[in-house]
Amino acid sequence: MSLRMRFKPSIENFVNLFSFSCLSFLSHEPHVYLKKASLFGSLSFVSLVKTSFGLLEINLLVAATVIHLIAPTLFEAPTTHLLEWPATVYLIMLGLRIAVLLAKQLLLLLLR
């Protein structure tokens, strides 16, 4: 299976991307949007990549991102940082997993 066949954009993923961008514009603090700008780049990539991740894992990514983005804007208490950490750790681990899978696929393509 080639790497190209692993990329399967779907309507649901584009809807998720649209909701991410809406959430970013609803954020009333500009520094929150700037701080999370790099997150959106990786999310657009993650949303379009359908590898061995199921729909459940993509939905967990959506939930983690929503918590990560709107928790600081909804509540102005120090406890919101506790909500951000699990989402951040999950996104980092998911990003590493995707990087390993893509590197593995690329290596398999090069060795053929």
From Swiss-Prot:
**Recorded topology in the membrane:** Multi-pass membrane protein
Subcellular localization(s) per the UniProt record: Membrane
Record has Transmembrane as a keyword: yes
Q: Which keywords fit this entry according to its UniProt record?
A: Membrane, Transmembrane, Transmembrane helix
Report one GO cellular component. membrane
Membrane-spanning residues: 55-75, 91-111
* Additional record remark: Partially overlaps AIM9.
Name-wise, this protein is: Putative uncharacterized membrane protein YER079C-A
